[in-house]
């Protein structure tokens, strides 16, 4: 049994991670400001004595109160920390770009917390640190330095995650047991129907018989990993003493046109049409994970293909849309 602290525990990845870690009889403390984390995701944990919640924002001074809670609930002991705190959807992080930047900068306080308790720390970084890769760097491996616009609309997230990696690199050199994972597009249950990401958009639009909206001409590509594969990777990476960074994503690559047509195929009752709108500035043309390093370190290899994962995700959203107002 471990004592595990999760920042961003009410979000999409966080909720799935809590689910898996509680199955292993760990005691878990989740911190979330519920800016993008969802209170609906907490229902399943209400009567679980091993899952505790603390509402707080890591960009303000919550750490003294958090340490008091760790002292009282965790016998002043933490084994592992997962930092998932940060809005990850452009629709969400562009609403408050300064707060998005400050959330990434708050990794300094989390590093100090990890060192105080001699805990392992896993930082959820992103494939967005690679920006808009050229053809010579496709797929992207961890040695690629990226092609990021530092003054663009997405910079608050992309550059925030890059500086967070730099901070972790420096803390690692002075003894922080931290590690970095660069997460590629991920989907599955507990996604917010209104988070604006492509799979949640396409599936919800199709289920509601709305137009499936593709931005650009649909030839831009992504690799999509199902959430269960990511959660396996995060837990296995945490077991190692490696710093990384490591990529985690499904190396199968699909265009937006292929994705939209697959969603329509899997929801045959949908009357949705596919429409096209202008591609937002700095939206990457292609993104594909090279997972050689993660596979060699701890055997990470996604098992769930896109069609299988979409079927599971569609079933989740069929239930979710009965309880949620879909805005897009």
Please state what every model-predicted region is.
Residues 1-184, 228, 312, 316, ...:
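N-terminal Rossmann-like NAD(P)+-binding domain of SDR-like oxidoreductases, especially those catalyzing
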Residues 14, 60, 191-192, 223:
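Nucleotide-sugar-dependent glycosyltransferase donor-binding/catalytic pocket residues
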Residues 17, 56, 185, 204-328:
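C-terminal substrate-binding subdomain of Rossmann-fold SDR/epimerase-dehydratase oxidoreductases
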Residues 36, 189, 250:
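Short, conserved catalytic or interaction motifs in soluble domains
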Residues 163, 167-171, 202, 259, ...:
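Hydrophobic alpha-helix immediately C-terminal to the catalytic Tyr-X-X-X-Lys motif of short-chain
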């Amino acid at each position: 049994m471990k004592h595990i602290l999760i920042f961003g525990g009410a979000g999409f990845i966080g909720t799935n991670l809590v689910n898996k870690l509680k199955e292993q009889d760990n005691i878990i403390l989740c911190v979330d400001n519920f800016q993008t984390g969802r209170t609906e995701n907490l229902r399943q944990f209400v009567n679980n004595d091993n899952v505790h919640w603390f509402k707080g924002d890591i960009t303000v001074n919550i750490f003294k109160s958090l340490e008091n809670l760790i002292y009282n609930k965790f016998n002043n002991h933490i084994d592992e920390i997962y930092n998932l705190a940060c809005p990850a959807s452009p629709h969400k992080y562009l609403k408050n770009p300064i707060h998005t930047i400050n959330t990434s900068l708050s990794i300094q306080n989390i590093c100090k917390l990890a060192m105080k308790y001699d805990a392992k720390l896993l930082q959820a970084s992103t494939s967005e640190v690679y920006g808009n890769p050229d053809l010579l760097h496709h797929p992207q491996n961890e040695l690629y330095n990226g092609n990021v616009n530092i003054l663009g609309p997405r910079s608050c997230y992309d550059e925030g995650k890059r500086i967070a990696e730099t901070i972790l690199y420096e803390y690692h050199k002075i003894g922080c047991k931290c590690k970095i994972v660069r997460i590629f597009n991920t989907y599955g249950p507990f996604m917010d129907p209104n988070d604006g990401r492509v799979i949640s958009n396409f599936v919800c639009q199709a289920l509601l018989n709305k137009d499936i909206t593709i931005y650009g001409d649909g030839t831009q590509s992504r690799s999509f990993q199902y959430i269960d594969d990511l959660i396996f990777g995060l837990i296995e990476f945490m077991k190692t003493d490696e710093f990384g960074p490591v990529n985690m994503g499904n190396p199968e690559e699909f265009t937006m046109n292929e994705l939209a047509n697959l969603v329509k195929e899997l929801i045959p009752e949908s009357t949705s049409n596919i429409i096209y709108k202008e591609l937002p500035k700095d939206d990457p043309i292609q993104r594909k994970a090279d997972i050689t390093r993660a596979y060699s370190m701890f055997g990470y290899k996604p098992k769930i293909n896109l069609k299988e994962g979409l079927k599971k995700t569609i079933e989740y959203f069929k239930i979710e849309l009965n309880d949620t107002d879909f805005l897009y």
